[in-house]
């Protein structure tokens, strides 16, 4: 793992076991997600099933017309944007009550003395149970919450809906 991180080919996103404004202090070094540092290389790797992968796949991808779950691709792009600003990447996961499932907020950013939870969606933006639960559970630490997707700017109750391409501008405000 250390060799991968030192080579800068991957980005580590650490789980925080007790989210607060001191994310680095509460990170769990044994629980993390890895993203590739080069989104172009990652895109080529996941769509190149054969030496003659059709160019139409890339055209559909760029035109948002590819019928595939691209959540992992968008999450990877967001991780790359976060770390390009010199920040570390963090996320948070916790058990749902009376369930074998977990909640997960894709990214946590420090917003001055508060936290900015960020959820990344590849398609539907109406379902955002995890970020809603996070904002309720950790309301004393949350400044605002953002859901990033391919959709236009909007608002859903207290959740700010933003296109992924706006993340660098959002991060300038932090």
Model-predicted regions and their roles:
Residues 120-128:
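Short beta-strand-loop-alpha-helix junction that forms the active-site gateway
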Residues 103, 127-131:
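Residues at alpha-helix caps and immediate loop-helix transition turns in enzyme cores, especially N-
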Residues 109-117:
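Active-site beta-strand-loop-beta-strand hairpin of nuclease catalytic cores
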Residues 132-135, 148:
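C-terminal structured domain segments
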Residues 134-143:
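Arginine/glycine-rich "motif VI" loop of SF2 helicases in the C-terminal RecA-like domain
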Residues 143-149:
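Short, hydrophobic beta-strand segments that form beta-sheet elements in well-ordered domains
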Residues 1-104, 109:
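Accessory nucleic acid-recognition modules appended to NTPase machines
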Residues 150-174:
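Domain-level recognition of nuclease-like catalytic cores that cleave nucleotide substrates
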């Amino acid at each position: 793992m250390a060799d991968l991180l030192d080579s800068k080919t991957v980005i580590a996103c650490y789980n925080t076991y007790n989210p607060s404004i001191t994310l680095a202090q509460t990170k769990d070094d044994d629980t993390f997600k890895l993203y590739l540092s080069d989104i172009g290389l990652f895109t080529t790797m996941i769509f190149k099933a054969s030496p003659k992968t059709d160019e139409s796949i890339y055209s559909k991808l760029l035109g948002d017309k590819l019928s595939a779950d691209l959540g992992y691709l968008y999450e990877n792009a967001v991780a790359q944007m976060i770390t390009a600003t010199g920040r570390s990447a963090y996320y948070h996961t916790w058990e749902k009550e009376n369930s074998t499932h977990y909640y997960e907020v894709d990214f946590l950013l420090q917003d001055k003395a508060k936290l900015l939870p960020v959820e990344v969606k590849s398609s539907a933006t109406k379902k955002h149970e995890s970020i809603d639960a996070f904002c309720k559970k950790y309301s004393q630490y949350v400044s605002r919450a953002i859901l990033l997707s391919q959709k236009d700017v909007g608002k859903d109750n207290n959740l700010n809906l933003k296109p992924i391409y706006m993340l660098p501008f959002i991060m300038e405000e932090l």
